[in-house]
Amino acid sequence: MELRQRRERLPRPSMRHVVVVMPSAFTLGNLFFGFWSIVSAFNGNFRWAGWFIVFAGILDMLDGRVARLSGTGTRFGEQLDSLVDLISFGVAPALLMYFLDFSNAGRFAWILCYIYVVAVALRLARFNVLSAGKPSTGWFTGMPSPSAGMMLAVYYPFSQTNWYRASLAYMDLQHEGLVVLMLLLAVLMVSNVKYPKFPPIGVRSARGILGLTVHLLILFGGIFAPEYFLFPLGLLYMAFGLVRTTVLGLMERPEPVTVIGERVADAHDPTLPPPLSHERRRHSGDRRQEPE
């Protein structure tokens, strides 16, 4: 009788507690695949090492979605997510590239992999600072580290395709291409280049339909032709941010500046007279104020 009463007094886990830990469970799953990728790369299984990073990226996307939909996002979860992302999308891709190509490229080739990890760490630290207490926008500042990490992860499966062997393998530029790719990704992650977030899924608005279409295309390509589809998709995403920033920079024009009703002369416009100095403007103003 007493044992039954004690059992009845024990608190039972509520659904609220289960929902709260779900985002962290996805994050720890992300860490699991990131660590498994490192072990696989060390053992020379480069194909699965890359796919494990992709699986980590899927869980990284899901933990944020679950936290937002359930309203259970916490500061602890945000910090845990950043630490896990550093391993899954920083250390794991860098070691994959090292064991795949850079281990035989010279004594100090590992430094490039280290630079990539540093860029991921800086990218995540800046993201935490910029997003603290601010509403989410539709753009990332700098290329997201999961996108960069997964792009490196799917390079090896892409390099084993017949299309790659028929069109690019004869150039024998794998090492040089990986050097350029890793440096470019490192620079883009710490840059101010804007990259779009995935649009939300829906059927009641144009943006929602666009998001649904994008997700379905990625799902279709990722299931039926992942080796051919994912790496070119990453290149397209990387190029989009660069092209967009370049075009917007070329379209920007300096606006005319007005000071006390007068247009300031532009150094590149010889038709405009030079602006009055402060002393000349003061004397001119004094003369205008004198009684006639």
Describe each model-derived feature in a short phrase:
Residues 1-11, 137-292:
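C-terminal membrane-associated helical module and adjoining short loops/tails
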Residues 57-62, 116-123, 187, 235-246:
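Alpha-helical transmembrane segments and their membrane-interface exit regions
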